Amino acid sequence: MKNKLPPFIEIYRALIATPSISATEEALDQSNADLITLLADWFKDLGFNVEVQPVPGTRNKFNMLASCGQGAGGLLLAGHTDTVPFDDGRWTRDPFTLTEHDGKLYGLGTADMKGFFAFILDALRDVDVTKLAKPLYILATADEETSMAGARYFAETTALRPDCAIIGEPTSLQPVRAHKGHISNAIRIQGQSGHSSDPARGVNAIELMHDAIGHILQLRDNLKERYHYDAFTVPYPTLNLGHIHGGDASNRICACCELHMDIRPLPGMTLNELNGLLNDALAPVSERWPGRLTVDELHPPIPGYECPPNHKLVEVVEKLLGAKTEVVNYCTEAPFIQTLCPTLVLGPGSINQAHQPDEYLETRFIKPTRELITQVIHHFCWH
């Protein structure tokens, strides 16, 4: 029953008060089960059918799919339930207590992105879901902040094919139709240790890595020359050398050296293509020193994403907002949802607040976000 649904601000408060941190470090990682239960109960109260999906390979994490209406197509509204960890020493407020001050709602997940579910639930108060002409789906995913395991698993297993989807990440209500991907690798070189007084008796891994880095930087230049997408502020794939470590003493021949690097590919570039380019770049080192160089993923890769600029979803949202779609450099779950249907990234709050101490969402987003959600539901599910 709709009258059982708490007021908007109390929904928001309950979501923020329910910790659901994702972290690669097991001691910090938390289940999102309690948050999923909250959402599931509220959507059931609104007349939705609810399915809770355990996500394999995670520490007790779940997706939730709430659905209402019959037939094919329809609209999917999606978002993630998890947050990043927080630095207790840098927050001036309790991260798990929603605090309103000076036109801002403070709390961990207010912008990125638990608040989106509060907006959806509040907008649905005024929607008669029994009269939907096409189905409406609400997807809440797990582990976006680490592996994106929830969105990956949902996209791999669902039979749903909505007409379109909106992911409510904080874009300041500016619609995003494309973003770059992310690939991170560890390059490891195994040398042979020995006393530095006789270099010929060992194989110095740092020297081999120096050779490998030269080839990697040549790949960086080749990517910049070969691939372009002018809509991006940085209109080519970037390659960054982010971390390196090797050796343990100045008088020992270095036995092992490890380099961490990332590539941010443009939409349309395949992960297999990029892996092939990296392997080709490192081939001279591998051929000269067989068995000493390995390449491993640091995190599951995220492909680039693009929604066709002439799709109906783009046209409708641009008309409703009076704003053109944009492209951005950060990553979301959009590449995985895009395998099901055309997808936009669009939500309240600023990406500049994501992952920051004293995270907040400005209250000026409340009214236009509620109106936008109502409008897109009416457009894609009532006609």
Curated annotation (Swiss-Prot):
SUPFAM superfamilies: Bacterial exopeptidase dimerisation domain, Zn-dependent exopeptidases. Pathway: Amino-acid biosynthesis; L-arginine biosynthesis; L-ornithine from N(2)-acetyl-L-ornithine (linear): step 1/1. Homodimer. Its cofactor is Zn(2+); Co(2+); glutathione. Its EC number is 3.5.1.16. The gene is argE. Binds 2 Zn(2+) or Co(2+) ions per subunit. It comes from Escherichia coli O127:H6 (strain E2348/69 / EPEC). Zn(2+) 1 binds at residues 80, 112, 169. The lineage of its organism: Bacteria, Pseudomonadati, Pseudomonadota, Gammaproteobacteria, Enterobacterales. This is Acetylornithine deacetylase. HAMAP family: ArgE. The active site is at residues 82, 144. It holds the Pfam family Peptidase_M20. The keyword Amino-acid biosynthesis applies.
